[in-house]
Amino acid sequence: MPVPLQIGPLGPSDVEGVRGLARAAETADGVAPLSEQPLLRLSSDEGWLTHVVARSKAGQVIGYAQVDRGGEDASAELVVHPEHRRAGVGGLLLRTAERDATLPQFGGTAGHHGKRLRVWAHGNLEPARAFAAAAGYVVVRELLFLTKPFPPVVAPVEPTPPVTEPVEPAPPVVEPVEPAPPVVEPVETTSASTSGVVSTGSTTGGGSTTGGGYRVRAFVPGVDDDAWVALNARAFAAHPEQGRLTVADLHDRMAEPWFDPAGFFLAEAPDGTLAGSLWTKVEGDDGEIYAVGVDPAHQGRGLGATLTAVGLDHLATRARRATLYVDGDNAAALATYARAGFVPTAVDVQYGKATGGTPVPRALPSR
């Protein structure tokens, strides 16, 4: 039976339907099928974004794909309801995404616009690997999920007061009384003395100073927004997702319940410009190093390591484990995080048509 498709912006009921679909898939698979960015963009009507909804005969949302043509390559994320899999819905969504990847960035007629489609598979589960192989797709990018447990916080234990047994009083001993010597009163003398405690301290405007005159402080909403977006674009100029964040994207994240400016750290250069940043995100027992980046003009000074240490200290009292994502081909970052005690526990992958790429890898354990 043909599956009706709805292509275009989503209304409020559509958004709730897609969120319900994602929850059902996560319950069945043990991993969220859609990442944060597509969920934040469910209500977006940007011209470079396509929403594809598949419905059952009864009108239930049973499949969803989101196609993003804003980057160098088009990327897509898709999900099918667990009760409607192996019925052609996934293939229909993928073919629609492939067609839409050829559209111009801001809509229009399909054609050859140089957009290669990259499809995310979160967790890279066995059904996703089989689906990708059948469609002629191979892995072109790996995003590793690293974790590090924090030692448990042990509350101080109040010492138990000793139990004192009552002591029977000893009978008085009567000694013979010697005659008392004469009492000589001491002569008081007057002397002048001084004592005092000298304390010194310094303030840095709410932050702490690092080597080279850099200062680490917290993000100030409404003040640092534009400067941080510009810094982020410089730090992630080669990153296909992070480097494209806009002020509107920043504000979307600031509206999320997990946002806490006290866990959003900025490194200022001696001249006051932003040189680096680290953003943390706490949800449940997980404390994520959400994004850490350093302006290329300030790299090589240890700012990344300094910011990471500050972030981990912040998270240690707020979460049971630290988490972060890093590209699988970033050997330097992987080595740094391994030395810090992080280990890979899951992987998200991007698939592309088999004109290059690597064989489908074995999935890591679920988060």
From Swiss-Prot:
What domain of life? Bacteria
- Reaction equation(s) it catalyzes: 1D-myo-inositol 2-(L-cysteinylamino)-2-deoxy-alpha-D-glucopyranoside + acetyl-CoA = mycothiol + CoA + H(+)
Biological process terms in GO annotation: mycothiol biosynthetic process
In which residues is acetyl-CoA 1 bound?
L78, V79, V80
In this protein, which residues make up the domain named N-acetyltransferase? Answer: 5-151, 214-365
Task: List GO molecular-function terms, semicolon-separated.
Answer: mycothiol synthase activity; protein-N-terminal-alanine acetyltransferase activity
Q: Where does 1D-myo-inositol 2-(L-cysteinylamino)-2-deoxy-alpha-D-glucopyranoside bind?
A: E36, E241, K281, E288, Y325
Q: Where is the composition biased (Low complexity)?
A: 185-202
| Keywords, alphabetical | Acyltransferase, Repeat, Transferase
State its Enzyme Commission number(s).
2.3.1.189
Where are the residues of the annotated region Disordered? Answer: 185-209
Residues the record lists as binding acetyl-CoA 2 = V292, G293, V294
Q: Does the keyword Repeat apply?
A: yes
Q: Which InterPro entries is this protein grouped with?
A: Acyl_CoA_acyltransferase, GNAT_dom, MshD_Acetyltransferase, Mycothiol_AcTrfase
- The reply to whether Cell membrane figures as a keyword in the UniProt entry is no
Q: Which family does it belong to?
A: Belongs to the acetyltransferase family. MshD subfamily.
How this chain assembles, per its entry, is: Monomer.
Q: What does this protein do?
A: Catalyzes the transfer of acetyl from acetyl-CoA to desacetylmycothiol (Cys-GlcN-Ins) to form mycothiol.
- Name recorded for this polypeptide: Mycothiol acetyltransferase
Which species is this record about?
Answer: Xylanimonas cellulosilytica (strain DSM 15894 / JCM 12276 / CECT 5975 / KCTC 9989 / LMG 20990 / NBRC 107835 / XIL07)
Gene, per the UniProt record: mshD
